[in-house]
């Protein structure tokens, strides 16, 4: 007979989420197609059938969310001439940590003549959560890229407020082997107070960064500024033969954020438009 009490449970560790999803896309017979697919653990990738246009991939975390000690890794590579739109089935949720940080690592590679759109839905951080998010991008000359990362601190409509949490967001984007964009954004542990600062978020609880790299990014500058309005900003840089368009958006909640983020993504993503799962 097995007797369970607090003494013999104290040394047990909780099962952790570990997921790895890898996708390679090639252009063959007039279409962008899968050339390699690997899935492990909680990471799953599904591709809705499309006859024309870019390959669309939907990333799924079957665990339903992440907490301290959980790991999720995504790796996407596009061969010459391929195009792909990568999104997620739902918002990623980062729950209260019992110890340690949740980690999400993404690596994107795009060869010459490709077009890659990385468009995950929002990441929602709950009170006392800890998240380390990392994005590494390698672009060859002539590749086009659109990246969106949106973060929400609590769901105000559900009465949730984030007072304490830790969030670290690291970006490295290289074009032709040279770094053209880098970010080291950190908040915490007093997130509730820090978000109130004018230089941080001015009281906003939802934010997004949008990065576009292509030769003609500048043509979207004025339209993007009109969509963004006063709660955010948009700027343009020349990086070699390409241009870099950077957008920052802030809003009081996720609903208000999406009201501007959705038309912005639809604009910048061209004929591919907004991923269908964003509207479900």
From Swiss-Prot:
Its main location: cytoplasm. Keywords: Chaperone, Cytoplasm, Nickel insertion. GO terms for cellular component: cytoplasm. One of its GO terms (molecular function) is nickel cation binding. Pfam families: UreD. It is found in: Cytoplasm. Belongs to the UreD family. UreD, UreF and UreG form a complex that acts as a GTP-hydrolysis-dependent molecular chaperone, activating the urease apoprotein by helping to assemble the nickel containing metallocenter of UreC. The UreE protein probably delivers the nickel. Required for maturation of urease via the functional incorporation of the urease nickel metallocenter. This is Urease accessory protein UreD 1. The lineage of its organism: Bacteria, Pseudomonadati, Pseudomonadota, Alphaproteobacteria, Hyphomicrobiales. The gene is ureD1.
